[in-house]
Amino acid sequence: MAKRNIRIMGDSILNKTSKVIEEVTPKIDTLIDDMLDTMYDAGGVGLAAPQVGVLKRLVVIDVSLEGNEPIILINPEIISTDGEQTGDEGCLSLPGKAGIVTRPNYVKVKAYDRHMKPFEVEGEGLLARAFCHEIDHLDGILYVEKVNGEVHEVTSYDEEEEE
């Protein structure tokens, strides 16, 4: 397992559509582990394969406080949504920035696990937002295309405490 470089907005790979994964090869298995390492190291709650330069329909998400409940989604599809939430959204591919985005408050996704077994998973709040955000990446869509208003600078809690 290893950390991979996160592609930054402006890299053309982030605007391309990812390809379906037909089988989990050893290379894909390693990619899953590397993406988890990369996401946790960067302090993110989700990461899509294009963000590490791979045009495959693969997403990893973990919104748990402890960072120990990873959700691996291969070929994910949103099958239902409900409600609405509006809030700040950021992205590891656009560090130090955030913007107000409206997303569904409830999302149900069908996908395959790392053994290519189909499953469904649902989430509300932050998890629903993460599902939408990461699946958008697989279709070459960045959250900045959905921002209400302007993208703004994000100050970390550490910087605020020093002031």
From Swiss-Prot:
Question: Which cysteines bridge via disulfide bonds?
Answer: none
Q: Which residues form the active site?
A: E134
| BP-aspect Gene Ontology terms | co-translational protein modification; translation
Where Fe cation is bound, by residue? C91, H133, H137
Gene it is expressed from: def
Q: Which InterPro entries match?
A: Peptide_deformylase, Peptide_deformylase_sf
Report the EC number(s), separated by commas if there are several: 3.5.1.88
Q: State the family it belongs to.
A: Belongs to the polypeptide deformylase family.
Q: Keyword annotations for this protein?
A: Hydrolase, Iron, Metal-binding, Protein biosynthesis
Role noted for this protein: Removes the formyl group from the N-terminal Met of newly synthesized proteins. Requires at least a dipeptide for an efficient rate of reaction. N-terminal L-methionine is a prerequisite for activity but the enzyme has broad specificity at other positions.
Which protein is depicted? Peptide deformylase
- Catalytic activity line of the entry: N-terminal N-formyl-L-methionyl-[peptide] + H2O = N-terminal L-methionyl-[peptide] + formate
One Pfam family, short name: Pep_deformylase
Query: Any signal peptide, and if so, which residues?
Result: none
Check the record and name the NCBIfam families matching this protein.
pept_deformyl, PRK00150.1-3
Q: GO terms for molecular function, please?
A: metal ion binding; peptide deformylase activity
Q: Which cofactor does it need?
A: Fe(2+)
The note on cofactor binding and number reads: Binds 1 Fe(2+) ion.
Record has Transferase as a keyword? no
Origin superkingdom: Bacteria
